[in-house]
Amino acid sequence: MRSKLVLYILSAFSVFSCKSEEQKKEEATPLHTRGEITLQYDDSFVNIAEALSQRYVKVYPNAKINLKVSKEDQALEDLLNHKVDMIIMSRELTEKERKYWDAKTKLPWQPSYFAADAVCFVVNKNSEKQHVSLEEIKEMLKSGAKKLIFDGANTSNLNAVLQKLNLDLKDVKYSRLEGNENIIESLEKFSNHIGVVSYNTISRPYGERATELRENIKILPIKVGDSLFLPNKENLKTQKYPLTKLLYFLTDEGTFGVANGLIRYSCTDIGQKIVSREGLQPYNLYPRTINIIHK
């Protein structure tokens, strides 16, 4: 009986020691390499969000990033209410939103910019229309003809256009379809309409889906004075394209966990190369140094 008691005590001590060692090992593992978070973002940012998060979890397989698509304004609301861990935004917060951020998070508002995207105006490939101007866009929104197709209110694309043209949501009229890809596909049916989509939806140079979408549309350059500007990397870099959008992360994570790890990964060299491969303009430019050795 006594020997059984001793054996039980030794077994319990062994299990306790193993658990302690496992706990110590886990505690020694950096927080940004393990754990689970939810990243929420507008439909406009699907491709870049997937590319960055998928690469991150390949580097850190013990990290899990759940992806959630919503309207841009809904993503901000969910972050402020602690329903998600981080979001992608393309517009600046209003003064009221900044005050709410300060009250809800107790953290400084610190946007982490990582890419330049754009709002694109696209038509069916057979359309005779060659370009569009900001003045024309404003007139179409106010006319009631609903020739512009957006992906709904409170979305990144509509937010950017309204902000640029200094218009209020209640004063504009437009057609609506859910999803940037759906808008592009609908232009074959609605040949007299103009689709308003994110550049990121079609920017992947060699992406099979992006290529398929590009083949059926024509991107309208925006006319400014006598110049025409397309949403290409150079015009996004200089922001000469009038509807350039700067994408950034926001998180209320108070430690250097998976959320802040993803931010650092996305904003430094490797992440910026991924941004470039997605066809977007990297926000942070890393100069390449070439050492020439004279013999």
Segments from the language model and where they lie:
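Short, conserved beta-strand segments within well-ordered enzyme catalytic domains
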Residues: Q40, N66, D85-I88
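Pocket-flanking alpha-helical
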Residues: D73-K104
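Short, conserved acidic/polar surface loops in the N-terminal third of protein domains
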Residues: I9, R98-Y100, S133
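Central regulatory/effector-binding core of bacterial HTH transcription factors
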Residues: P61-E77
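Glycine-centered small-residue hotspots that permit tight backbone geometry or close packing
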Residues: Y41-D42, K71-A75, H82, G261
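Sec-dependent bacterial lipoprotein signal peptides
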Residues: M1-F16
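Exported/periplasmic ABC-transporter solute-binding proteins
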Residues: C18-Y60, Q110-D117, V122-K295
